Amino acid sequence: MLKKFVLGGMTALVLAACGGEGGSASSSAPAQSANASGSLIERINNKGTITVGTEGTYAPFTYHDKDGKLTGYDVEVTRAVAEKLGVKVEFKETQWDSMMAGLKAGRFDVVANQVGLTSPERQATFDKSEPYSWSGAVLVARNDSNIKSIDDIKGVKTAQSLTSNYGEKAKAAGAELVPVDGLAQSLTLIEQKRADATLNDELAVLDYLKKNPNAGVKIV
C-alpha cells in the first residue's frame, strides 16, 4: 500500500531573497519577493545568462539521458524560462547538500531541483517562483522489511541527504541518519543492507522503481 506523507512539495524555482538569512526552495520561475525578483531579472538580463544549480542525478526532475544530455522536468522548465527571458541558460551540477549554500553565496541565480521550502529558516532566506508541480513524500524499505510507516523508523538507519526536507523529517521521527549524496545512493544502501529505509519524493522513487524493477525495495 503506497502511503504518502504531508511532507509533499510544490515544485518551483528558488532564488536567494534580498537581505534575508534563512531558506526555502522549489523549482520554477522567481516570484515571491517583488524586490528580489526584480533585481534578479535585471541581473540576469545584464549578464545575458541565467545560472542554475541542479543535481543532474535526480530523475525525473534533473538527470542525464542515454546520450549524456542534461534533461528532466525541472531542467526543461528552466530552459523554457530562459527562452522566455531571451537569455542563455548555464547549469551548474552540484550535490544537494551544497546546493542552497551555493545559492546563498551567489554561485547560482536560481536552483531547479524539486526543492521544497518548508522550514522557517529556508522561507526566511530564499524566495521561490510560482509552483508548477506537486508531489508527495513516500517511505521506502527493502522488500522483506517489517517497516510499515514512518512511526517505525525510530532508531532505524535511514539514508538521507542531511540538509533536505526529507532528512529533517526522518530525524524528527527519531531515525539514525546515514548521509548520502542523493536518492540513488540511498536506495543502493538499502539494497546492500547498509541502511534500512529512506524518505523521498514519490515521483522520483516511482521513476527509479520503473527503471529498476528488480531493485529489491518497495514503497511501504
Where does each model-flagged region fall?
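Acidic, polar ligand-binding/catalytic clefts
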Residues: 79, 88-152
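Bilobed "Venus flytrap"/periplasmic-binding protein-like clamshell domains
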Residues: 57-59, 70-83, 135-185, 202-207
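A ligand-binding cleft/hinge motif common to bilobed small-molecule-binding domains
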Residues: 115-123, 169-172, 196-220
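C-terminal motif of bacterial Sec signal peptides marking the signal peptidase cleavage site
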Residues: 14-17
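Short helix-initiation/N-cap motifs at beta->coil->alpha
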Residues: 91-101, 162-164, 178-192
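Extracytoplasmic small-molecule ligand-binding "clamshell" domains
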Residues: 31-114
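Bacterial signal peptide processing site
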Residues: 19-22
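Short beta-strand->loop
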Residues: 125-133, 178, 214-220
